[in-house]
Amino acid sequence: MAKLIVDGIDVEVPNGASVLQACEAAGKEIPRFCYHERLSVAGNCRMCLVEIEKAPKPVASCAYPVADGMVVKTDTAMVRQARRGVMEFLLINHPLDCPICDQGGQCDLQDQAYSYGMDHSRYAENKRAVKDKYLGPLVKTFMTRCIHCTRCIRFSSEVAGVPEMGAVARGENMEIGTYIEKALTTELSGNLIDICPVGALLDKPNSFVARPWELRKTVSVDVHDALGSNISVDGRGSEVLRILPRTNEDVNEEWLGDKSRFAHDGLKRRRLDKPWVRVNGKLQPATWPEAFGAIAARLRSLPGDRIGAIAGDLCDAESMVALKDLTAGLGSANLDCRQDGAALPAGRREFYTFNSTVPGIEEAGAILLIGTNPRRESPVLNARIRKRLNMGPCPVGTIGQPADLTYRADHLGNGPAALGNLGVFGDKLRAAKQPMIIVGQAALRGPGGAAVLAAAWALAVEVGALTPEWNGFNVLHTAAARVGALDLGFVPGPGGKDLQGMMGGGVDLLWLLAADEFDTARIGADTFVVYQGHHGDRGAARADVILPGAAYTEKGGTYVNTEGRVQRGFVATQPPGEAREDWAILRAFSASIGQSLPYDDIGAVRDRLAQVNPVFAHQQGLDRRGCTDLSGPPAGDTMGDGPFGVAVPDYYQTNPICRASATMAECTRTYTAPLQLAAE
């Protein structure tokens, strides 16, 4: 530890820390443009100049290491004059675009010019102008505003792992851009907008829409993948206008995937805003009593074993426990939440959660990916794996379809046969201090999925990934609702049917709770389908009765991420038209048939959640534990010999919100369609 004095305050920081970090530890605010806590140090903006005793001139605090006994001054006349000079140089070529710039009101350059700049300009020469660059459908460029901080270059190379941005030329001719003019091929490109300190990189789909001070901010949880990234939903009136990441070191740090950030325009398209009932083969608008009456009329003649329910990928825990209680009251054990057919058992949590936790990735000594492409399934988690590799040696092996993960990985095979023949990588896995195995949904689909899960667990035991201090067995989900549903036991009860068993006439009444990710053509022609959800998607097209529900931004909901971390979102906007929160719809229907569910408000529903599974009583907290019980999950059928499939064939089209989004459709045309054409 190094001891130094900052503006008369004694500070102790680790050896190797920068002077800027020491100043922050002393509570001093140091202006900066190029420095970012999660990127390498560039030291090229010079805005963070401070005075160090016995130094001949001001030094850049972000790039200067501390030394024992150092005396630092952050607010002397020399420092103020130096910062004023730097700001004057930065503004020489910067246009006066503040009144029309989308960054206005949240611009670092604006704020620091006010605090450290001059009240007039002495520059009377011509300003330079730079041609705007094309970076794809999500990031808009105004390169004349660029101050060459190089944050975007470092983010692309270090965090996203796609080194497509760089600087060309030198001096006043220097420009930032892509070496070849094409769209950025990263699922994290929206983060460039957040880290840009000026208005050079902006939100293209939402440009010139609103000022930041006009927006109402609501904390929430993302549902577009299973990581549960913490987000801020910014709305005005009844419309969501943007979604930004919230910092959570244990989940998403401060990053957010492009789908989570930009798909919100799908929240206002193809919405279900009133009940519908199919009459003579055609869906007709109806009232709530008429819709409930149509369902009740069908229920009267049915025994419990002819009723089934399927929960979708975006459901909150409150609606799932209400539907489970409703079906139980009707005498049915036909439940399923695994639309993709993944062989995941409910019960012991270690068999279906990411046990090492997301921060635990940084402690892994070696990583084996089985049937998963984390770049497509969870880009922010993939960035965490890349971060681990940037910290030091960590061999990575993959079993499944070959893919560019943005980091070096040994491809060991395409299917389950490779689990028994890891070769040299197996030796690396056994030699690693804390080996990690990540199993994806593509490996668990199909009749051999249970055997793959059991084999992966046995492999974890064999390589030493399961110890009292470390649990290196992890399941990476693709659905935000999946872990919560398994925690609630939303799977077939004794004698119950799974999704496959409910298809083809296996039940006479099927309740789809926002379930759109399976082939509805498999449903029996005579099966009466109730679809409860928020978008007119696949499930609604097959429905006999449609009950309009609320999207994730329109209700307070509890979600459990792939780690098993319980998180909660809050209401940002109101549902459109006659749509209502899903648990309330189920409660109202139960009352209409004389079997009222035992809760009247959201607090009572959450008490019921904690009663069903105590994990719902605790939010955010997640204790990482080792594994003391080495007995594995049931093996089921034998493993197949075919290759694993792909869990997410199109990153931008994974749920009804994305499929309704014009922005996501443009991304598919830009990124996915050319790849599919090339493959053909």
Where are the regions that the model predicts?
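N-terminal export/assembly segments and adjacent metallocofactor-ligating motifs
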Residues: 1-16, 24, 36, 51-55, ...
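A cross-taxa feature marking solvent-exposed loop/turn segments within ectodomains of secreted
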Residues: 55-57, 466
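A basic, amphipathic helix-loop patch mediating RNA/tRNA/ribosome contacts
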Residues: 19-53
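Long, low-complexity segments enriched in small/aliphatic residues
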Residues: 604-680
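Short, glycine-/polar-rich solvent-exposed loops and beta-turns at beta-strand/coil boundaries
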Residues: 35-44, 64-65, 170, 604
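Generic alpha-helical structural context detector
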Residues: 21-24, 88, 194, 328, ...
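Non-catalytic alpha/beta scaffold blocks inside enzyme catalytic domains
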Residues: 335, 339-620, 671, 675-680
